[in-house]
Amino acid sequence: MSDDTTQIEPAMAQETSPRANTRKVFVKTYGCQMNVYDSQRMADSLAAEGYVATDTPDDADLVLLNTCHIREKASEKLYSALGRLRKMKDARAADGKELTIGVAGCVAQAEGQEILRRAPNVDLVIGPQTYHRLPNALARVRGGEKVVETDYAIEDKFEHLPAPRREETRKRGVSAFLAVQEGCDKFCTFCVVPYTRGSEVSRSVKQIVAEAERLADSGVRELTLLGQNVNAWHGEGEDGREWGLGELLFRLARIPGIARLRYTTSHPRDMDDSLIAAHRDLRQLMPYLHLPVQSGSDRILKAMNRRHKADEYLRLIERIRNVRPDMALSGDFIVGFPGETDQDFEDTMQLVRDVNYAQAYSFKYSPRPGTPGADLDDHVEEAVKDERLQRLQALLSAQQYAFQDSMIGRKMDVLLEKPGREAGQMVGRSPWLLPVIIDDNKDRVGDIIHVKIVSTGTNSLIAQKLA
């Protein structure tokens, strides 16, 4: 998952009561797709309380920062933002006005009271498992409390979140995220997720289908199922049998209006036969798979507690491509994990060559407090990490550009997602996730049209519509 920073657009929380004219919220999102989804659900919850969204903190009564804790710089971004908000809050106070500041997400879960110590201007700290309590927490803040809500709730948060209004969902577009699973039980030694998101929890089939049907009714054509370890999802199916993610995908594909399905992020250990069968038989399931491996060295994979070997990963990729030859792969890589030798790194480079990724994310290892990796010895020098990352990214970039170039001349169906920058231009999404720009097009957002790729842009494809 990427670490792009986004914000909730004003359309995502509309006026629902007379109080809406006096209370505005600005939600800023750091981190992964799950955080984007969580921010949308928090916006829905606040809309039910009479808040309207604004695209700037300048006129907001509530600023909510939904944070990421995967890498150190994400925490640094939070405290930098809080420093700027402190000045804004002080200026408001000088004018006799109030600004409520809340911190949500994984940094909130990891640091809790420490956030209030480092940033006393913060009024509210709320974790990813308790944000359904946000309205109550804000009421306590208005009563003069400093609130920290980071316990793991006994109740099911999804049962306590209001469903977004149809008009609100419609304004979010024709592609949507849907969280089906949270948490992780893998305990990779570099990762904070088990400590910030908790143990693996799967939502029920009933909940998932109901939310998917609401999204489809609002015009959503493409669903991306989310989870920290999404292919670990399991639950009792409508036929009384135990279902895995493969069976769930087949069920969602039956919902009228849903034309495309994706899922992220996966673990190689949980790619079972039913999920591979879904890739073989389900045309709505797009031929793009994010399957992180982190390293190509068995020794480093063991130190990371990844629970698989490099050749097992490669054999899995072969199985998937045997049933879906047009499958494109993306992945995650960490360089400079403690003890990584030159040979370990070369093993990673070879695995990348063997797989030939369409896209990948790569990072230098940075120890996260509280993880087993932080206590490992034999740390790799920063200069060595830098050199290895540069080499790896050069190889991955070459593969990405080659993949884009391989699209030239191909014909494909594209889901139109939004107008382009120029008049008559539309931007769509290819089956392989790349944005596609189509000129002189009269079709509407939500239409799926047949195009031919004629050239490439920077991380995009240029297409002509076919009759």
Swiss-Prot record:
Major location category of this protein: cytoplasm
EC category name: transferase
Species: Brucella ovis (strain ATCC 25840 / 63/290 / NCTC 10512)
Cofactor note: Binds 2 [4Fe-4S] clusters. One cluster is coordinated with 3 cysteines and an exchangeable S-adenosyl-L-methionine.
CDD domains noted in UniProt: Radical_SAM
Domain TRAM: 405-467
Protein name as annotated: tRNA-2-methylthio-N(6)-dimethylallyladenosine synthase
One CC-aspect GO term: cytosol
Family of this protein: Belongs to the methylthiotransferase family. MiaB subfamily.
Sequence positions that bind [4Fe-4S] cluster 2: C184, C188, C191
Compartments in which it is found: Cytoplasm
Domain Radical SAM core, chain residue ranges per copy: 170-402
InterPro entries: Elp3/MiaA/NifB-like_rSAM, Methylthiotransferase, Methylthiotransferase_CS, Methylthiotransferase_N, Methylthiotransferase_N_sf, MiaB_methiolase, rSAM, rSAM_horseshoe
Function: Catalyzes the methylthiolation of N6-(dimethylallyl)adenosine (i(6)A), leading to the formation of 2-methylthio-N6-(dimethylallyl)adenosine (ms(2)i(6)A) at position 37 in tRNAs that read codons beginning with uridine.
